[in-house]
Curated annotation (Swiss-Prot):
The active site is at D496. A motif (Conserved SWG motif) lies at residues 741-743. The chain crosses the membrane at residues 539-559, 581-601, 625-645, 658-678, 684-704, 711-731, 800-820, 825-845. Changing D496A: Abolishes the catalytic activity. Changing D496N: Strongly reduces the catalytic activity. It comes from Phytophthora sojae (strain P6497) (Soybean stem and root rot agent). The gene is CHS1. This is Chitin synthase 1. GO terms for biological process: cell wall organization; chitin biosynthetic process. Homodimer. Gene3D superfamilies: Phosphotransferase system, lactose/cellobiose-type IIA subunit.
Amino acid sequence: MSGAPPPSSGFAPRSYGQQPLSHAPRSSMMSVEYDGIPLPPPSIRSCGSQQYVTSYIPTGAAFPPSSVQDMISSMKSYASATDLVRTYSEIPSVEEALSTLDRAAAALNARRYRDALKLYLEGGYAMANVAERQANPKICNLLTSKGFETLNWCARLCDWIEGRIKEKHPRPGVHKVGIPVSNWDEDWVGPFMDEEEARRMWYTPVYCPHPIDFSNLGYRLRCVETGRRPRLMICITMYNEGPQQLKATLKKLANNLAYLKEQMPGDEKSLTGAFAGDDVWQNVLVCIVADGREQVHPKTLDYLEAIGLYDEDLLTINSAGIGAQCHLFEHTLQLSVNGKCLLPIQTVFALKENKASKLDSHHWYFNAFAEQIQPEYTAVMDVGTMLTKSALYHLLFAFERNHQIGGACGQLTVDNPFENLSNWVISAQHFEYKISNILDKSLESCFGFISVLPGAFSAYRYEAIRGAPLDAYFQTLNIELDVLGPFIGNMYLAEDRILSFEVVARKNCNWTMHYVKDAVARTDVPHDLVGLISQRKRWLNGAFFATLFSIWNWGRIYSESKHTFVRKMAFLVFYVYHLLYTAFGFFLPANLYLALFFIVFQGFQQNRLEFIDTSEYSQTVLDCAVYIYNFSYLFGLLMLIIIGLGNNPKHMKLTYYFVGAVFGLMMMLSSLVGAGIFFSTPATVHSIVVSILTVGVYFIASALHGEVHHIFMTFTHYTALIPSFVNIFTIYSFCNLQDLSWGTKGLHDDPLLAASLDETEKGDFKDVIAKRRALEELRREEKERVENRKKNFEAFRTNVLLTWAFSNLIFALFVVYFASSSTYMPVLYIFVASLNTCRLLGSIGHWVYIHTEGLRGRVIDKSECGNGTGRYPQNSYVQLEEHYAALAEDQRTYASGRTNASVRTVNDVSSAA
């Protein structure tokens, strides 16, 4: 048999009835074959004007030419559409055909349905015609399939225009297209997966203005179609990183799957059966979300295409006329290292059409993909993060051992720290990361509240974050900044801190956070001071306002959550510590200045340096030393404020390096003088204890955790850069509070764009003039709104900057003129020693917690405590199956020719589900 049956409304396909998720056979997703060559798929009716088509398109041989000619000549199938349009002009090139379909999508968005029908019909015919002139079989078949799809859509759109379909706004249906991958190795497949899964990549253009409607609009991930439901989903966010970073991240994930596979069932430290054995890869789904099609590194796309996870031709042709916000590629990867094959990785590559933000990428991941899968656990990480081979195992083990844990993070470290010891910026960050893990996260984990689970590598129990916590997490995506204001806008620069707090304070729950030391991940960090300034601006602003938010809303833990009385009392202790630590950080620039002033320069002036006799110097020389110090320090601070207001750090690189070097020399001089004073004066118990609790804590805690060599090798680097961390980063951050580009740029639709799309330029002359005047008025109001928002944000920036600067200035002047070194320094030492004592006790407590795990497991069973059930949250997934069953029933109703049947809309079906 040759030729394809014309895709008419009366044709009933034989194997396209959608079944519930867990029962849909793979064969039902294939198109009808003739003489061994799959022909273009007929349309599938599922709901209103919507459709769901899954078709596999071969690329080795072209479709028979007669099938295309039969389709074009069968005009009776499109009689209604032709009567409406009555015009047809052949478009001679692929570029013009694609452009016509894009204009059709724009007309459809503007609700100019008859114009859209005309353009879709022209574009569909053009696709079918230009396909015959393509020498490449792959391009020929893709164009032919697109032509069939578009003309079928024209027939359905015509039915809607003439009132035969009841639906509010018609949209092209879901069309998932599969093509063979080029790098398939038939010798590799072996026992892990079948040939079909290994050879095929699937692409779906996604039109979904709101990701939460992904499932309701009929989109399905490939693993759902094949009856799989992964228990662990991993989100990898990507922006413009190179291919080497993505390659390293994926291979480290494959190593983690191999480690999970080798776990022995029944062992005391083994995971449940889903995360062990040869089929462990089927319970893990990796989602790579790229923020903007134009922003992705071209070589990264080349790498993705090489491994079968991207195809430019497929995207260009099949997304035409859809107006897709996201391009979805799905494939089970086959990676190898040095000829050794790794476990398969079920992978989804979501390429967003427009740049929005990392938060928007998480919005797609959580509300579209994870909401459909309903995994038990979900992890988030950045491209470039490299997990050690057992990192995922340790996180999953913590979740399975204690079902009260709602979120957990591993130990994040700097990549190749010892190879970069000559780079002081990298070494200082390595010290900071280590101390944060050893002291801060260990302390917070003892209380059950980790202030921030880093987006570079952390994991959550999906049950703990689904609902209210995620709604709060994505708040800035749904509400305009004019309404939120600058405080909340800056707070959401550290949205992961908000998510952590919302999980712990969740109403009627008692979730806790946990730090897993053995789950180690290496990450790439900024290599120079300028790059670090830009990064820390986002971190510091977000952390400061998020901390104020958590302090202000701490009462929710007591009034809304179901934590035990003992846990709430522990949170009260942590709240006091958190409050003192935040206050100390606010006045840290003044305290740093005062410490340098009293230790070095006033000691030099008053001959209090035991190892240097300054009595022989004239008073003028002694006073000049103090004046020079004050002038240099103040000049450096003023310079930082001036260049921080409205200047990009990249344009002031030399200035920042100069100021950082001056502050670094002052800090090193202070450290040497302080060491000289300590070793030249008689030792007392008080001085030894204070010294240990201020500086020795870093070495004691790191030695306890077996990482003291990291601290020894990078302590000098960090000491020299302390003034840069305190002064440069903080001043630049407060000088740019009005800049929220990291968390909010491009997150909101432009109302002017929507207005221009709705403008039809139809009607009489007066109507057109009135519409143009209305659009001009809208533009004027939008301009005023943007200017007012800019003024409000800049005023907020100025007020906060002045408050912070004058608070530190007044505090420093008060101490200098009304206190002495003998009064201030002991108070400072005791305060710092007290905070560090708390951190040390927390580090020791976490060390004891780790090394008594076996004993606690025999005494305390937390496998069924808390909110976790240890099972899937089945309710939502059952609703999803009911939703797709309803779509399948609508499809069968339409295909059987029962034209009088009541066809439900997508919203009606989702409400019923």
